[in-house]
Amino acid sequence: FLMPREMVSLPFELKVNRSVPFSEERLFMCFDELGLEHELYFKRVNEVSGGQRQRIMLAVAALLNKPLIVIDEPTSALDTGSTDKVLAFFRRQAEKGAAVLAVSHDKDFASGCHYLIEL
């Protein structure tokens, strides 16, 4: 099984992302914002819950410094406290200049977004 630290590094190895330096320090800052323990980084993926893996990859998406973050069901495997942290995390990304487009069936999460389109 992969370890989260191996999962996290993969996007930075793609040619399109090679100009973005990977920083464990920045990753752990994101972990703190998302309520993740630093030791998760060193566990095996099968020892990390689905909700924790989801938040780890949200941190990676933010580290790539893209102008648009597109996320499908970012809170589907999360409890209310973690959902609130994810919403606050996305708001901080928006304050830093990123646009965040999220698809969600979670009405509580959606109600915390700046703009809402219901289908």
Residue ranges and their predicted role:
Residues 80-82:
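Helix N-cap at the start of a conserved alpha-helix in ABC-type nucleotide-binding domains
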Residues 22-39:
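Conserved ABC ATPase "signature" region
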Residues 44-48, 52:
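Conserved ABC ATPase signature
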Residues 103-105:
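H-loop/switch region of ABC-family ATPase nucleotide-binding domains
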Residues 58-59:
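Hydrophobic anchor residue at the start of the ABC signature
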Residues 69-73:
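Catalytic Walker B motif of ABC-type/P-loop ATPase nucleotide-binding domains
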Residues 2-17:
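Q-loop/switch helix immediately C-terminal to the Walker
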